[in-house]
């Protein structure tokens, strides 16, 4: 706790939290946008699903940290590389959950909407996404967890800012108390995000769908 106090006093802890969270938000936003788009295409177009469906499942099994070498080659030691690792670690969880959610929508529900004139982006935003919302929330929650691990892991390996960097500084200086203190902060942020964001969303979904 003393190390947390020192970090808070000199601002390094708050700066590290802000840096990591910014990278996380950007990477997760990219993953959510890309994952929803890809998942809907896979669910609505069988040729797309047959072409890349198995590939998406395979790519999801790759740990985020395994993308670090490619990130370094393509982006160098930069924020873009860390954001890439963050986004790629989360996008496939969002994709798979979106695909599952859209696939589980009653076809008659979609046909009724189309008969009423819904098509294109209107069909997606007004019909498909609301109907698949419970699955989307599950995908966002999984994606957040993967993204948070990805950003911290990438920062440990090639960053000069962020919570992962502070962890690495503790390792290099053999400062066990600093390492543990930063780990506590990382865990605390995870608990807060889960409780303040995803628990509330899940409760709303359960209430909306009559599950709670």
Regions inferred by a protein language model and the residue ranges of each:
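Short cytosolic juxtamembrane segments of multi-pass membrane proteins
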Residues: 199-212
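Generic hydrophobic transmembrane alpha-helix motif, especially the helices
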Residues: 57-93, 100-101
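Transmembrane-helix boundary motif in ABC transporter permease subunits
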Residues: 26-56
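Alpha-helical membrane-protein architecture signal
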Residues: 10, 14, 18, 48-52, ...
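Periplasmic/extracellular loop-to-transmembrane helix junction in inner-membrane transport proteins
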Residues: 1-29
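Hydrophobic alpha-helical transmembrane segments of polytopic membrane proteins
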Residues: 163-201
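Short cytoplasmic-facing helical segments at TM-TM junctions of multi-pass membrane proteins
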Residues: 97-139, 163, 167
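Transmembrane alpha-helices
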Residues: 84, 88, 120-154, 177-181, ...
């Amino acid at each position: 706790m003393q190390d947390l106090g020192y970090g808070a006093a000199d601002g390094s802890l708050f700066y590290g939290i802000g840096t990591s969270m910014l990278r996380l938000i950007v990477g997760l936003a990219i993953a959510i946008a890309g994952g929803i788009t890809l998942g809907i295409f896979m669910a609505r177009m069988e040729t797309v699903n047959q072409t890349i469906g198995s590939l998406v499942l395979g790519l999801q099994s790759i740990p985020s940290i395994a993308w670090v070498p490619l990130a370094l080659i393509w982006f160098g030691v930069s924020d873009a590389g860390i954001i890439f690792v963050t986004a790629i670690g989360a996008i496939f969880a969002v994709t798979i959950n979106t695909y599952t959610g859209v696939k589980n929508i009653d076809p008659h529900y979609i046909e009724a909407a189309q008969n009423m004139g819904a098509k294109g982006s209107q069909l997606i935003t007004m019909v498909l996404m609301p109907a698949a919302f419970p699955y989307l929330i599950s995908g966002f929650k999984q994606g957040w967890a993967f993204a948070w691990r990805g950003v911290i892991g990438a920062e440990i390996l090639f960053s000069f800012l962020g919570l992962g960097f502070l962890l690495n500084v503790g390792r290099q200086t053999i400062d066990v108390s600093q390492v543990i203190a930063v780990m506590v902060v990382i865990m605390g942020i995870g608990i807060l995000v889960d409780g303040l964001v995803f628990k509330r969303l899940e409760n709303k979904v359960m209430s909306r769908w009559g599950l709670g």
